[in-house]
Amino acid sequence: MQVEWSKGAERNLDSIEAYIAQDNPAAAAKTVVKIVKRTFAQLSKHPASGKPGRINGTRELIFPEIPYIVIYSVPGETIFILRVFHTARDFENLPEQGVTVFPLC
């Protein structure tokens, strides 16, 4: 299956990298690469492996060794990554809480 990242998810990855880079630039790049690689590896083979999402029509992928949640949807043959955020964030009060499954922005 094909995996596509929304602009919102790409912005999330940029923000994650910028935040971590304040203290450790090398770790910042490694973290983002790990999120992207693990997400692709898991979802391209097992698109339903995430748990049902808190937003209707989504699923959530959580990796124990990476403290980030990947919100995605699978409306057909393409997996759409909608958002990525740290598990310590308050999901209900995220500034980008308005995740819409369609259309992707």
Report residues per predicted region.
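Basic/aromatic recognition patch in beta-strand/loop cores that engages polyanionic ligands
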Residues: 36-37, 45-79
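Arg/Lys-rich, positively charged N-terminal/basic patches that mediate binding to nucleic acids
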Residues: 1-33
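Solvent-exposed interaction patches of small proteins and small membrane subunits
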Residues: 23-24, 28-31, 51-58, 83, ...
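A general structural signal marking secondary-structure boundaries and capping sites
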Residues: 20, 24, 43-47, 88
